[in-house]
Amino acid sequence: MLSVPRDLWVNVTGIGEQRINTAYFLAEIEEPGTGAQNAKDTIEQNFGVKMDYYILIQFEGLTTVVDAIGGVDVNIPSPMSGYDTGVIHMDGTQALAFVRDRSGSDDFFRMARGQIFITSLWKQLLQPNQWGKLPAFVGSLSAVLQTDVPVWLYPRLGFALLRTGPDGIDSRVISRDEVIPFTTSGGAQVLGPNWEAIDQIVEELFGVTPE
């Protein structure tokens, strides 16, 4: 799992040089319904990793999903802005604030929080005493999820996630060490990619060598 900073300055498919987080919404403005595919194309074009499918959930949908299973116990491994080390039970509103908050930190910390939350949610759902909540989880998720994953593939993906478990996933973040902050000619403060360093991460994670 690789988290990419939203201000990374890349060549956005069909648009040109822009922040990577514009790949979705600028395409949606131009032609509704094309945003997800354009985001996939942009990732493939810049990182050299084939994107088979996408899963999109709006931040607000996270609240619905978390509340549907009665909250999530989030394990915070080290002190963060506003949070001490340990397990904190979060409802939907608290979980949304946790993954979105950048106060006292920045986008790099936000990405780390996102991975911490996903791992905590995953571990919780794998506990036998939580299996009774899976129907509510799946139902709430399907209501707020947008994806091109075919339905027939759902069981296979589910078994793969169950077999692998969150501890079997290598999670990385494109950090300050892989970017160079700069200001564009238009005055935007963005992050220039150090492709040599990023390509090394991509090769280690996905086993591909970007061209």
Task: State where each predicted segment sits.
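Non-catalytic, solvent-exposed segments at the cell envelope interface
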Residues: 1-211
